[in-house]
Amino acid sequence: QEKKKIILSGSDYLSLFCDRDWLSEAIDNIVKNAFDHTESGAVIGITWRALPSGIQIVVKDNGCGIHPEDIHHIFKRFYRSRFSKDTQGIGLGLPLAKAVIEAHGGAIEVDSELGRGTSFTINFLIPTKL
């Protein structure tokens, strides 16, 4: 029993024109990554909100964090950190998530601090009429 907690927080009234299955798969991969790299009792937060120019989704955990030498490589296919060899996976979850998010016109950023956790921020712009 890992006893990890997910906290969901956001507006009930946001909508995003997207391929629901693929975008769900992308976010699932990010959340699974958080589960894989947190200890028992960890908290994983998933928040979403409207911004003036779009929609933002944040997946944040209080896990071990991503080592600075790895942070610029985590979206490369088949990349596995030497610090994550004890977890399952082949290094395709985050690259797939990034590809799906970008195919939807979005962008993903990662911020991490060793021993404090990691935050993935996804932004989707809302098209405006000119």
Would you name each region that the model predicts?
Residues Q1-L8:
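Short conserved segments within the C-terminal catalytic ATPase subdomain
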Residues G93, A97:
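Short alpha-helical Gxxx[C/S/T] motif in the catalytic ATP-binding
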Residues D61:
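Acidic ATP/Mg2+-coordinating residue in the GHKL
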Residues G41-S53:
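Short beta-strand/loop element within the Bergerat-fold HATPase_c
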Residues I66-F78, K98:
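Short conserved segment of the HATPase_c
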Residues G105-G106:
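Conserved glycine-rich
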Residues S15-C18:
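Conserved micro-motifs of the catalytic ATP-binding
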